[in-house]
Amino acid sequence: MKTELLKEKYIKYELTQDDVFKHQHYIIITRSGIEKIAAIENIGIHFEIVKCETNFAAVKAIGDNGEISIETFGSALKGESYKDGNTNTWYCLEMAEKGAMSRVVLKLTGFYELGVFGEDEAEDFKKNNN
């Protein structure tokens, strides 16, 4: 059943092999896939900065598709490695925003309940880390 639902969603959102890949434990949708889904569903997203410091940022994302509105969060902590942070870049606010956007889109479209995550939600989900 889950496989059939995923297949239907891949077709509906015109996702290609470049947009989706298998992580060791999860199915991951890339940034390009998230953008396609958001455009097809006409999802509007508003961001509010919760906290922004030199090496930490938290963002609240409010997403709306005309029928449903949800709120979720994204955060980024710069560390020396992924053992003491979830990013190694200095642009924490942008990373938090990307994660929050992925989460909003996937929640509004039902991918989250199928165990699908966005590539921007965790460095461990990047394609080259598999």
Regions found by a protein language model. Give the residues of each.
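Polyanion-binding surfaces on beta-sheet-dominated domains and ring/shell assemblies
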Residues: 1-130
